[in-house]
């Protein structure tokens, strides 16, 4: 088992505003809109809690933008998420990557090739792809490869997916730190609030489905993944922590892609209370017992 070996310590002052964003997934315009909405400034501590890349429209722009922010301001901290570790597959020249980027249009590697005007079909093997990336994007990929897995402060642990329930949380496997599903349904033994993304909060059972962050202070877990890109109705969340000696304050806000509309009439659904709630992908307890393939429309 590979445990977390890249842990960064952060000493926050008695008074501080901490802005935490996770699961950006290549949506550069949403990220900029969210930073503007929270009135982000250089005095804030900005923590990007993993998954800068993949699935969205411009992963390369997000990487470059956040990399620049972190180089200009020592109060910007960035963690790795599971979607950011594809750089390791590239460095190891894993042939699987060629199949991955041929099937997925919105990837960091495809963004890099597009930026260079290189057609994926002309690349003969993974070694050639690796050479192209190293020659043109070595600073970005080295930066991604060096990102820590967790950040620890006096009050908080920031990690992308979750912690194992072990006495010493630093013995958490890196795999679980980056990919653990539904951490809010589990427990941990760290005596600090653990802030995670990775698992869209709408996947957790609720009477009224919501993409807003969930703060469970009894479990000492705050989950902030708003399902951006992953969910059709998803949003990009920001957790705002006002750190103060006599007690912290917690707020959140979000941005999404949807146009603003005016509500002209209230409408109440007449539904059986027993039928309220939702089923959100992925819900592994549900398995299809019968099905068939349908042609794409």
Where are these regions (language model features)?
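Acidic, His/Gly-enriched loop-helix segments that form or flank divalent-metal centers
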Residues: 124-222, 228-232, 244, 252-254
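Short, glycine/charged-enriched secondary-structure capping and boundary segments
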Residues: 33-37, 61-64, 92-94, 172-173, ...
